[in-house]
């Protein structure tokens, strides 16, 4: 199985409390476990249980993004304990209707919510996208009633840009442009 790495080697970022490591095939089982929690899946899958086939497809897409684009989601690991916290990072949204299709996002196990980890990891992902990958704009999307994610978007500097309907569901979108 392709692990998404290139001859440049896997990418790892560190923050004060997290290790953000390039997505690997072994992360799939943890990803399925993450979305077994209905509260985690609530905004991503509109209240439906996430099927393991869909999560397998998503994980494979993350590996392809790392291989082809040298960016993608990171597995977020707690530095103190080594625990798998969730996914934080960049994701190319091929279905996005505009030219800027790279999104910053996060999905964390519920026990890690409310600690500022999405903010910390989101900022690191933005620095990586702008600094290492030279992106000019990074977007983020959420369900309109996902106030926690919208709050993180604002805390890391994204500004509200409007709404779109994607796959029959309304989403709000935010963006931040590279400065300098």
Task: Identify what each model region corresponds to.
Residues 1-111, 124, 128, 132, ...:
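GNAT-family acyltransferases
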Residues 15, 140, 148-149:
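Short linear Ser/Thr-Pro motifs
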Residues 55, 118, 142:
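Charged, low-complexity surface patches
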Residues 83-84, 145-161:
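Conserved active-site alpha-helix within GNAT-family acetyltransferase domains
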Residues 106-108, 114-128, 147-155:
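Conserved acetyl-CoA-binding loop-helix of GNAT-fold acetyltransferases
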Residues 132-141:
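Conserved GNAT acetyl-CoA-binding A-motif
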């Amino acid at each position: 199985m392709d692990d998404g790495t290139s001859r440049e080697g896997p990418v790892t970022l560190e923050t004060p409390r997290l290790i953000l490591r390039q997505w690997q095939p072994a992360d799939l089982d943890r990803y399925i476990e993450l979305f077994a929690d209905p509260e985690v899946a609530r905004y991503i899958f509109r209240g439906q249980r996430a099927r393991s086939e869909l999560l397998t497809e998503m994980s494979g897409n993350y590996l392809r993004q790392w291989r082809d684009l040298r960016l993608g989601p990171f597995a977020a690991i707690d530095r103190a304990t080594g625990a798998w916290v969730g996914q934080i990072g960049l994701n190319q949204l091929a279905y996005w209707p505009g030219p800027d299709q790279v999104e910053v996002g996060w999905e964390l196990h519920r026990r890690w919510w409310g600690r500022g980890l999405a903010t910390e990891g989101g900022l690191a992902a933005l620095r990586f996208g702008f600094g290492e990958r030279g992106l000019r704009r990074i977007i983020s999307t959420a369900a309109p009633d996902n106030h926690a994610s919208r709050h993180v978007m604002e805390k890391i500097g994204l500004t509200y840009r409007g709404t779109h309907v994607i796959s029959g569901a309304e989403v709000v979108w935010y963006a931040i442009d590279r400065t300098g």
